[in-house]
Amino acid sequence: MLDQQTINIIKATVPVLKEHGVTITTTFYKNLFAKHPEVRPLFDMGRQESLEQPKALAMTVLAAAQNIENLPAILPAVKKIAVKHCQAGVAAAHYPIVGQELLGAIKEVLGDAATDDILDAWGKAYGVIADVFIQVEADLYAQAVE
């Protein structure tokens, strides 16, 4: 789990996510597709162009930050998203790429306001959240095989 300092930093970024979340996630997707074009087929590009997907991701990241001390509270949303991930063919191997590009987008959008402490905290938080998604998706993939 996350240490208290990390939790405090994540909670302190909630107002920033409310203000800049969609810009961060739009930048994230732009960079993800430019640097990792192999993941493009996993995404509905119409939802990208309409900003529906960046808005949805921004809301998910915000919900995770708001519930960082009680991540089980977002498990119902995680399960719904995981079903979509499994339908699209998302694999555990994609999560490190996503984490790298998400942190890069935070830095790109926030500039110097994205301190090393903030980026480190979000790196740790992303790791915990990604592990939850990976486990839920592994369970779904296993059920599909049965």
Curated annotation (Swiss-Prot):
Domain of life the protein comes from: Bacteria
Positions of the Globin domain: 1-138
InterPro entries per UniProt: Globin, Globin-like_sf, Globin/Proto
Complex and partners: Homodimer.
Pfam families the record matches: Globin
Assigned protein family: Belongs to the globin family.
GO molecular-function term, one example from the UniProt record: nitric oxide dioxygenase NAD(P)H activity
Protein name stated in the entry: Bacterial hemoglobin
GO biological process: one example: cellular response to nitrosative stress
Keywords: Heme, Iron, Metal-binding, Oxygen transport, Transport
Cross-referenced CDD domains: VtHb-like_SDgb
Source lineage: Bacteria, Pseudomonadati, Pseudomonadota, Betaproteobacteria, Neisseriales
Described function: This protein functions as a terminal oxidase.
PANTHER family: FLAVOHEMOPROTEIN
Residues reported in the UniProt entry to bind heme b: Q53, H85
